[in-house]
């Protein structure tokens, strides 16, 4: 099996319903179709990644919550589960924290979850595959095209 499509931390997958691998093109379409998308932004991003994510926020006019700076991740999950957001994007969050938090959303809400991080996240509904730093930057650039 291709290592790009297995969990970065193999024990992070909580059940048999693992995330579908997605591409920047599909993520772009999902963001455009969403009525109320939100980006949950962690602190584990390098400077060049932050720059591209900032452009993404601006391009798609995404509401953003920074964790842990503005709100605790579990509080964000509870907030999203009871809110009217229909699409939640995640990036820069510590891998195993997001694995647990995304499980909460998967079980207790109708929010479509997408990990746009460089590591495959099995507990979201959609995820980028495991990517090298350069591939990840390329995926982010493709999100900004068009």
UniProtKB/Swiss-Prot annotation:
Biological-process GO terms, alphabetical: methanogenesis, from acetate
Gene3D superfamilies assigned to the protein according to its UniProt record, in alphabetical order: TPP-binding domain
Annotated disulfide bonds: none
InterPro entries named among the record's database cross-references: CdhB, DHS-like_NAD/FAD-binding_dom
Pfam name, any one: CO_dh
NCBIfam families reported in the protein's UniProt record: cdhB (TIGR00315)
Record family assignment: Belongs to the CdhB family.
Subunit-structure text: Heterotetramer of two alpha and two epsilon subunits. The ACDS complex is made up of alpha, epsilon, beta, gamma and delta subunits with a probable stoichiometry of (alpha(2)epsilon(2))(4)-beta(8)-(gamma(1)delta(1))(8).
Role according to the record: Part of a complex that catalyzes the reversible cleavage of acetyl-CoA, allowing autotrophic growth from CO(2). The alpha-epsilon subcomponent functions as a carbon monoxide dehydrogenase. The precise role of the epsilon subunit is unclear; it may have a stabilizing role within the alpha(2)epsilon(2) component and/or be involved in electron transfer to FAD during a potential FAD-mediated CO oxidation.
Protein name: Acetyl-CoA decarbonylase/synthase complex subunit epsilon
